[in-house]
Regions:
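Amphipathic alpha-helical repeat scaffolds of TPR domains
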Residues: 143-170, 195-207, 239-275, 305-311
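Gly/Ser/Thr/Pro-enriched helix-cap/hinge segments flanking short amphipathic alpha-helices
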Residues: 630, 679-681, 685-694, 699, ...
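Hydrophobic beta-strand segments that make up the repeating blades of beta-propeller
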Residues: 362, 372-379, 424, 428-433, ...
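Short coil/linker segments at helix-helix boundaries
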Residues: 165, 224-242, 250-295, 320-340
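Beta-propeller blade termini
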Residues: 360-369, 390, 411-422, 468-478, ...
Length: 858
């Protein structure tokens, strides 16, 4: 039995003791600095991180230098002490931080280890610099009244990490204990307690309550802080008042969301920019938020984050734009789309897919072989089970999770499908522990009757638990069986070779893939078209890696050589051929946890953060950064994302699920339309897909069999109080032609993962092509393995060419009709047409419902 947290409680307490001792050597314990110094330091903050003796000091420095608050990470051997006003620090340390300026971490010896500090809030002369103020463990991005509550995201109690129910119970107990301890601390405050003690105790309680969704209780805790600050004439109190106002604004805005967007949900709620139908009707949370944000901006008018939140809050109460003071207003013209591909309406509610939950993964695929695409969903909440929604074929979905045997599969931030045993039934791989603590993964075998069996241990994928966010299933040795590469956080990533008998062997060392990093995404693709699938690894805080498959079970790292090692703080990634030239290109997003970049973009201000990257394949397996050329040099904090063809022109578009853990990170998810491989255009506003809630697992799929890609987005954040309904955006249709293909491998893996498709067209006498690499798409969200390919208008399909994994020559099909579904079996001549009945999502067709082959009642 592996104990997640076993033996760590005492160690964690020891680290806390050392950290507090180290902090006390750097903090002013009295008002010994001259008042002029305190005044000059008003609004200036540093972040402090305590690193154990022999801990990863350089690792921490690199992350801080990139502008990320360390409270967002759980790095072994390091502990964030949060944001500390410069006025509270030792004079020499504060002076040194001021001298070097933001973005330059300073290392100082400390009792039991090392203290790493970095200036966050700039001095007045530096107010134009970006401040990364998002703290995952606090209500808002700025307030730092107490040591971080990041421990709420990890397990600090002994528990068997392979026992999912035990992990759930341990999490609940940990949170309950934290709330009890925080209440006790506030109740124990003596009359006239020093201001720092009052703020620390109430902020601890408020943060814990907000984590659970008790916004009213959290607001009361922060109001207690605000009342004390208003009554205290000291410079220290004046310096903290803005933070209290911001926290209260954020908490009240979230209270308004819970009362309206969650409890009284409609299809336009939280879609940015907000329409009249999205206005809050219940409670006064948003109105209170407007008042707090306005008062804050009177104190600190340069804060772009609060300025953005004020505009959003005003939209929710119907006073935008006129009700926002002109100097704080972000005008409506800033949000307009340059093009209009049509409105995608959210039909998740009537379709039966408006699950309310936290962040999680998504798979859209056919799990019962009936020709209708189903939806599988996971949740970061360790007590929430895996959900399977069966497509009834009438516009609605049925929750068959219990019947499928999935209720014991608790938690899991990400999902991906596979067919590891080549039986033709879609299996599920669940990844757990990402951003969190080591919890086991699960391989779920599809039994072919809409039930699943956990075969993780039997298959050889059990053993030690890890923090896992991403995995790539591919046939790396071309033996016809899908292998799996699993990317872990801070432990050795692993390559497992499929033996072909339902079991796997760890070949990581043999393959030359032994590395350790904070790996957030892994994807497979053949970058040099040599017939061997290569591997790209997206790391958070370190360079990204491209492993070239040399054949014979060996890989060579060539990321820098091929030009794809950036960005430094990356997340979701994928291979796709965005310009249809037959070579795989690469997109990598950044996870910059700041709200400030959003108003910067809309106001036309510089965005100093890292942009996403699009790397164009030069046709030899090396890449060129074409991000600015494509109009994508934007800083968009992204988590889940995927690609699809929203207008059936055959060029792949994409959707970014935005956000970060903080309740403050309300920003629209973004849709980008591909302009024939030459540029990408933001069509978020015109398509109506700019959801403000945090976006995670994303899938493009033709869920209604009408010949175009619909969009499913798993919505919700990391905290228990940040749950939200998922969204299903129905494609309005564009009248263009298309073809859907299901490939069945015989010598290749049966799911045909890693096959190349080329559709050769005659467009007005000119031969063109549309290409697809068979995959589920991005690393956070899985689209169907059946390939839907848009063919534009007026084209004639001349032939279909298929390069099967491991095959020497392509399989060629002719006589394929447009606007059809076909099945192609490797090595068999011709193809099999498949009939499909179209239907309207969310509107059951009269007389057209069908009984389930497994359960007529479904």
């Amino acid at each position: 039995m592996q104990q997640a947290g076993a033996g760590t409680t005492a160690l964690t307490r020891t680290r806390r003791a050392f950290a507090l001792a180290a902090l006390s050597t750097l903090l002013l314990l009295d008002a010994s600095l001259p008042q002029s110094t305190l005044s000059q330091s008003f609004g200036v903050f540093a972040e402090l991180v305590f690193v154990d003796a022999n801990g990863p000091v350089e690792h921490v420095q690199r992350r801080m230098q990139a502008g990320f608050l360390m409270a967002q990470l759980q790095i072994p051997g390091a502990r964030s002490l949060g944001r500390v006003p410069l006025s509270d620090l030792d004079a020499a340390f504060a002076a040194e931080l001021t001298r070097v300026g933001p973005g330059r971490p300073i290392v100082r010896p400390a009792p039991g280890g090392t203290m790493v500090g970095q200036l966050l809030s700039p001095a007045p002369a530096l107010l134009g610099e970006t401040e990364y103020r998002q703290d995952a463990a606090r209500v808002g991005s700025r307030p730092a009244f107490s040591p971080t509550n990041a421990d709420l995201l990890t397990l600090d109690v002994p528990v068997d990490s392979n026992d999912l129910a035990a992990v759930c119970e341990a999490k609940k107990k940990m949170l309950s204990d934290e709330i009890s301890a925080a209440r006790a601390a506030t109740e124990a405050l003596p009359a006239g307690a020093p201001l720092p003690e009052v703020m620390s105790a109430h902020a601890r309680l408020g943060g814990a309550l907000s984590f659970t969704g008790d916004m009213a209780g959290s607001i009361r805790a922060f109001e207690a802080i605000g009342e004390r600050l208003v009554a205290d004439p000291s410079p220290m109190a004046r310096g903290r008042l803005g933070m209290a106002l911001e926290a209260l604004g954020i908490l009240n805005l979230r209270r308004g969301e819970l009362d309206n967007c969650v409890m009284h949900h409609n299809r336009e709620m939280c879609l940015f920019p907000l329409s009249r139908a999205a206005r809050h009707q219940s409670g006064d949370g948003a109105q209170q938020a407007v008042a707090y944000f306005t008062r804050y901006l009177e104190l600190e008018p340069e804060n772009l984050e609060v300025r953005w939140l004020l505009n959003v809050a005003a939209m929710t109460v119907g006073t935008y734009p006129e009700g926002v003071p002109e100097r704080f207003r972000i005008g409506p013209a800033a949000f307009a789309s340059a093009e209009d591909p049509g409105r995608f309406w959210d039909v998740a509610g009537p379709a039966g897919l408006a699950r309310t939950d936290n962040a999680g993964g998504t798979i859209a695929d056919d799990f019962d072989g009936d020709g209708f695409l189903d939806i599988a969903l996971s949740s970061r909440d360790p007590c929430e089970p895996l959900r399977l929604y069966r497509n009834r074929g009438d516009g609605t979905f049925a929750d068959v999770s219990e019947r499928a045997g999935l209720l014991g599969q608790l938690g899991g931030l990400n999902l991906i499908q596979t067919d590891f045993d080549n039986d033709g039934w879609t299996d599920i791989f669940v990844m757990r522990g990402g951003w969190e603590t080591a919890i086991r993964n699960s391989l779920l075998r599809n039994n072919g009757d809409l039930t699943f069996t956990d075969v993780t241990e039997r298959a050889g994928l059990g053993g030690a638990a890890h923090r896992t966010h991403s995995a790539a299933w591919a046939d790396f040795d071309n033996d016809g069986w899908l292998d799996v590469f699993i990317g872990h956080e801070f432990s050795w990533s692993q390559l497992f070779r499929n033996r072909g008998d339902g079991t796997f062997e760890d070949v990581t060392d043999k393959a030359g893939l032994r590395f350790r990093s904070l790996t957030k995404a892994v994807v497979a693709g053949d970058v040099d078209n040599d017939g061997w699938q290569d591997l790209y690894v997206s790391n958070f805080g370190e360079r990204n890696l491209l492993f070239r498959n040399l054949g014979g079970g060996r890989f060579q790292e060539v990321g820098r050589e091929r030009g794809v090692s950036e960005p430094s703080f990356s997340f979701t990634t994928w291979f796709f051929d965005y310009d249809n030239d037959g070579w795989l290109d690469l997109l990598v997003v950044t996870d910059v946890p700041t709200v400030e970049e959003q108003p910067r973009e809309y106001l036309g201000l510089p965005q100093p953060g890292e942009t996403l990257r699009v790397y164009h394949n030069r046709g030899d397996g090396s890449f060129e950064d074409v991000t600015p050329v494509l109009g994508l040099a934007r800083v968009i904090p992204t988590m889940g994302a995927n690609f699809g063809d929203i207008d059936n022109d055959g060029f792949l578009d994409f959707y970014l699920g935005t956000g970060a853990p903080s309740y403050a990170t309300l920003m629209p998810n973004r849709m980008f339309r591909n302009k024939e491989g030459r540029a990408f255009v933001d069509v978020t506003q015109s398509t109506g897909t700019g959801h403000l809630q945090k976006g995670h697992g994303v899938a493009f799929a033709d869920l209604d069999n009408d010949g175009d890609d619909d969009l499913f987005a798993s919505l919700g954040g990391a905290f228990l109080g940040d749950k939200y309904q998922d969204a299903l955006f129905e494609n309005p249709g564009h009248g263009a032609s298309w073809l859907s293909l299901r490939l069945v491998g015989t010598k290749a893996n049966r799911a045909a993962i890693g096959a190349w498709l080329r559709l050769v067209l005659d467009e007005a006498g000119r031969e063109t092509q549309r290409t697809r690499w068979v995959t589920s798409g991005g690393s956070f969200g899985a689209s169907p393995l059946m390939q839907h390919i848009g063919l534009g208008r007026g084209a004639r399909l001349k032939r279909v060419e298929i390069d099967w994994p491991g095959a020497k020559t392509p399989q060629v099909l002719t006589g394929v009709a447009l606007n059809t579904w076909i099945e192609v079996v490797e090595g068999q001549s011709g193809f099999k047409p498949r009939s499909r009945q179209a239907f309207k999502l969310g509107a059951q067709r009269v007389g057209a419902s069908r009984a389930s082959a497994h359960n007529p009642g479904l």
